[in-house]
Amino acid sequence: LISLNKLLSTLSLLIFLAVWQGFAAYLSSNTLPSPEAVAEVFWQGCVSGQLPFHLGVTLLRLVVSFTIAMLLGCAIGIVLGRHKKLDAFFDNWLVIFLNVPALVTIILCYVWFGLVESAAILAVVINKLPNVIVTIREGTRTLDQDLLDMARCYGFGKRKTLVHVIWPQLHPFVMGATRSGLALIWKIILVVELLGRSNGMGYQLHLFFQLFDVASILAYTIAFVAVIQLIELLILKPLDKKALRWRR
């Protein structure tokens, strides 16, 4: 079954490349370069060091902002899920921040704090934080009260209860927030870099847009998507298997 799934996945990729090549040959235009042309630009970017440098800068911003948002979001989400009065007090604010456009937050952070790295990170964190809080809060509300009562009867401290009772139940929600967070946060980072940074993938994509360099836009996009896929395959899926091994 696994080999069949891999075969189907490979087949879908080959069909996509064939369709892409066909459209590129039919249009014969710079607006849709062929896969070969994009691969050549990708290789040149790697050899020159430009692509790895800007990709690394963006990934560093992603790691820092994502880590801050997840740590704060998990902590606040657990607190709100366990305390109804605090949840009622902050609920409207969560709804407001969930619906504030990312572009508005980014612009305000740059206006208030200047075109500095900390403002860029803050803008990304503010945009991601409400999503994490809401996801973890909903997960906390579904915690099995019987298990919590049992932990209390056995004299579990707060730390032991969190690690052995609360966290295993919250794991699916944390992984959901992580995956949706990666999908959201790198898009926000690109806008942040486009508006106020002098390096990174967003900055480069803005330059390529001004030059109508579609091949470079696609090459840089493919590079970033490939890295996100590697994070999923090498980090998130192994973590999932390890955390859920007790079910097997």
Task: Name each model-derived stretch.
Residues 201-239:
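Hydrophobic alpha-helical transmembrane segments of polytopic membrane proteins
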Residues 131, 135-177:
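Short cytoplasmic-facing helical segments at TM-TM junctions of multi-pass membrane proteins
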Residues 4-26:
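N-terminal signal-anchor transmembrane alpha helix
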Residues 95-128, 138:
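Generic hydrophobic transmembrane alpha-helix motif, especially the helices
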Residues 122-126, 158-191, 219, 224:
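Transmembrane alpha-helices
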Residues 26-67:
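Periplasmic/extracellular loop-to-transmembrane helix junction in inner-membrane transport proteins
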Residues 237-248:
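Short cytosolic juxtamembrane segments of multi-pass membrane proteins
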Residues 64-94:
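Transmembrane-helix boundary motif in ABC transporter permease subunits
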